[in-house]
Each structure stands twice: as C-alpha cells, then as structure tokens.
Amino acid sequence: MHEMSIVEGIRTAIEEAARANGFAKVTRVRLEIGRLAGVERAALDFAFDVVLRGSLAEGAAVQIIDLPGQAACFDCGKTVEIEHRLDICPECGGTRLLVQGGDEMRIKDLEVL
C-alpha cells in the first residue's frame, strides 16, 4: 500500500510548511491527483486517518481534485483524454499514446489556523 508513504510525505510537507509559516493547525488539505497516478482513493482515505493521527493535521478535511488523464496520439496527432495508461486513442483507435498529464499528485493548498 504505497498510499501510506504518500501520506507520510504529505505529513512531512505540512510539518515543514508549519515551521516555515508559523501555523498550528490544518483544517483542510486540498490535493490534486491525476487519474493515472495509480492512487487508490479508499486506501488514501485510510492512510490519512492513520498517518495524520496526532499531527497538526489530525481531523483535517481532505478534498481531492480529480485531474483527467491526457495523452498525445502519435497516429492522429491529437491530444486526447484517457482513463488508463493502456487506453487506445478515442479519436482514431491508435495505440501509440504518450501520457502528457493526469499522472501528477500535489498538495494544492492548506487551510490553516
């Protein structure tokens, strides 16, 4: 379950931001997660409950902004939306796609006290 290590990284980033900016409590964490990032949402929710326990973000609301998968098709030259890495081009049926977005994951912002 790599979601635990993802949330551990988020906890570290929150702690570093708290030290740098002087806040004591996080009430909301907004994340941008691409559909191609390979993150299981139920496992991520569980990891947040476990990893953030006892931290300044314990009990914070977690909002996930879903980013679509995007790929460039070498066959028709279009940029298309995809759901999975091995999808075919919805425009031409081509199989030579290069992922260009939707595999990212980042903290968009924090609501703090």
Curated annotation (Swiss-Prot):
Family: Belongs to the HypA/HybF family.
Organism (species): Rhodobacter capsulatus (Rhodopseudomonas capsulata)
Record-listed Zn(2+) binding positions: C73, C76, C89, C92
Zinc listed as a keyword: yes
GO biological process: protein maturation; protein modification process
Binding-site positions, Ni(2+): H2
Pfam family, one: HypA
Superkingdom field: Bacteria
GO molecular-function terms, A-Z: nickel cation binding; zinc ion binding
Keyword annotations of the record: Metal-binding, Nickel, Zinc
Matching InterPro entries: Hydgase_Ni_incorp_HypA/HybF_CS, HypA/HybF
Name under which the protein is recorded: Hydrogenase maturation factor HypA
Role according to the record: Involved in the maturation of [NiFe] hydrogenases. Required for nickel insertion into the metal center of the hydrogenase.
Keyword flag Lipid metabolism: no
Secretion signal span: none
